[in-house]
Amino acid sequence: LECIQSKKYDLILNIMKILHTSDWHLGKRLDTYSRHQEQVEVLDEIIRIADAENVDIVLVAGDLFDTFNPPVESIDLFYKSLKCLANNGERAVVCIAGNHDSPDRIEAPDPLARECGIIFVGYPNSEVPLFKLDSGLEVIRSEAGFVELKLPHCNEPLRILTTPYANEIRLKSYLGVDDPETELRKVLKDRWQQLAEKYCDISGANLLLSHLFFTKEGATLPEEPDDEKPILHVGGAQAIYTSDIPSQIQYVALGHLHRKQIIDQEPCPVVYSGSPLSYSFSEANQTKYVVLLEFQPDKRASLKPIELHKGLPLKRVRSQGVSEALEWLKQNPDCLVELTIVTDAYLNASDRKLLNQTHQGIIQIIPEMLQGTDSDGNPQTTNINLSKGIEELFAEYFQHTKGLPPDPSLMELFKEVIANKKDF
């Protein structure tokens, strides 16, 4: 009853409620550790927030999956979660592809999804078919890169400029530009402006939904997350300036960066909602959010970040020796750990076994070797570079423990053992 009364109140005030989320990365692992159960729990939390806040539409700004070919359990979780969010067509859900997603996979279930009020946009030039549901949800107008919706419990329409991820060459191709010298920024700015002038007036809410790298011109670029496929690289897509956004747009809902952040407030809030879980140790201790927006015609969007509480915290821990590490692990069981141990000798197999038996959430153990002292008597350390090849690491270990390098015959034997293990 409270939900119905609240929705009637919003309708009287012409308030449209939008929930912005992104970067679900379903199927993501932390090294070999599955995050599936955490993803189940955090998506259920997002569904509960959407229900509690009487949200009219949910926007998912790309990186729905972590790979082009996600596991079956992740696909199942994705569709079941969207169906719950859509609430039998009473609430619209719009999802776009990110740089981790296969656009064809994202769009494949679109005909069936539309029957539930779910819209998938895989490509920058995708055009959403017109449709109307018994709930009152309707696509009123549509063309490549644009969709206008009539939401069941809102008086005013919602206009969305949709720009899923594509690399620079493909983006230009999709938007009909063949000149390789034309800047991507100009191509997008011109296209967005054309759509905004055609469709986005003050009689409805107007927003941009994208999975690209936005920045304020002249500002320091935000860091792309660790373990993330970067966008800013040769063959990717250049950074887009907030000044390229049409003045008619009231909010820009972005995906790609995993930390919730407001890139700019002009010409409107330009916001990365961030991922719902911490997916790498560079995100350790980050608080995760979804962003609730309240729209009224011809007014600035009102933002309310809502904190998410599900998922195991990620911890980076540095300990002086194995004993100190064991004590910390016993006192902090409910987390995922990147453990650095300062030691004067390589960790042996029994030490590693004891550490892993003590804590089920150890993702990586990094030995930090003592290398004597500096001129002031302070201990000097160096991390073992785990990005090196296994053969190089073995040679360094042998040198450290024996005081001389392994001879060629021993290295050949080591290579044979490793090869047999891979075959096995």
Name each region found by the language model:
Residues 132-138, 142-156, 163, 268-332:
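Binuclear metal-dependent phosphoesterase catalytic core
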